[in-house]
Design a protein with these regions (language model features):
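Sequence/structural segment immediately N-terminal to covalent heme-attachment motifs in c-type
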Residues: 32-36
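Short acidic-glycine-tyrosine-enriched beta hairpin
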Residues: 165-185
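Conserved short histidine dyad/triad with adjacent acidic residue
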Residues: 120-126, 130-150, 179-183, 217
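Ligand-binding loop in jelly-roll beta-barrel domains
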Residues: 182-206
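Positively biased amphipathic helices and basic secretion/translocation or surface-docking motifs
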Residues: 1-14, 26-27, 37-40, 51-108
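Short beta-strand His + acidic residue motifs that chelate non-heme Fe in jelly-roll/DSBH
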Residues: 46, 145-147, 166, 184-190
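Amphipathic alpha-helical interface segments
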Residues: 198, 202-220
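Glycine- and acidic-residue-biased ligand/ion/polar-headgroup-sensing regions
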Residues: 140-143, 149-165
Length: 220
């Protein structure tokens, strides 16, 4: 994806460091990966973190292997082949109308489902019934997401349109990061709406009864 404007909102250093060291959960990795595809600045910062991580690994004292390590490895070689994975939808087959991030390649992507007035979501398979959730969100122009807070960090990468949250405007290529406990109520651009790739760690907590009602039905 080629952008014609500078990216002004990025994941913070803690998120990028976790990405570099492999400790960031898969849902958030997919969103950060999407951001890195469009953001040279974050790719550069990530390179610095990866270099630091490499130095830290080299500085660690070697750890002795368990006495049965070889036997356990050999046992896995004798184990039967796991069944082939079920066929999955690919981003190329997903009728989104926009270019999907390469970070979603190979991920199963569900169909758009009505979630709330003017809002549809598409779940990333395998990342819905877990603590970490990843999904695409499509909001019609001028739609307000129900007021909510959440247990963990929420990341939203803008793929189309624009989003306004906490008086900040996020456009294509931007990554909106909301910290745990932040109560917020983003709304989509009044002219274009928006499509975002979102990762949430933990539960969201709608502040209003309408949001709680919706949550009962869609388990977000
Ligand atoms: Zn960035």
């Amino acid at each position: 994806m080629t952008l014609t404007r500078p990216i002004t909102h990025h994941p913070d250093d803690g998120v990028l460091l976790a990405y570099a060291t492999g400790t960031l959960g898969l849902a958030h990795r997919l969103v950060v990966g999407a951001h890195l595809e469009t953001c040279p600045a974050c790719r550069s910062r990530l390179g610095g973190f990866e270099a630091v991580g490499g130095v830290m690994l080299e500085a660690q004292a070697p750890v002795a292997l368990a006495s049965d390590a070889l036997a356990r490895v050999l046992a896995t070689l004798d184990a039967p082949e796991p069944p082939p994975p079920a066929p999955r939808l690919t981003p190329a087959s997903f009728p989104l109308g926009i270019e999907l991030p390469k970070s979603l390649a190979g991920q199963g992507i569900g169909p758009w489902r009505w979630t709330a007035p003017g809002i549809e979501i598409s779940k990333i398979e395998g990342l819905w019934k877990t603590r970490e959730r990843c999904f695409l969100l499509r909001a019609a122009p001028g739609v307000t997401v129900p007021h909510h807070d959440h247990d963990g960090v929420e990341l939203a990468q803008l793929l189309a349109g624009a989003l306004v949250d906490e008086n900040q405007r996020f456009e294509v290529g931007d990554c909106a990061q909301a910290e745990p406990g932040l109560r917020h109520q983003p709304h989509s651009d009044p002219e274009h709406g928006c499509i975002c790739l979102i990762a949430i760690d933990g539960r969201t907590r709608p502040s209003h009864w309408t949001g709680r009602l919706i949550q009962r039905f869609i388990d977000i």
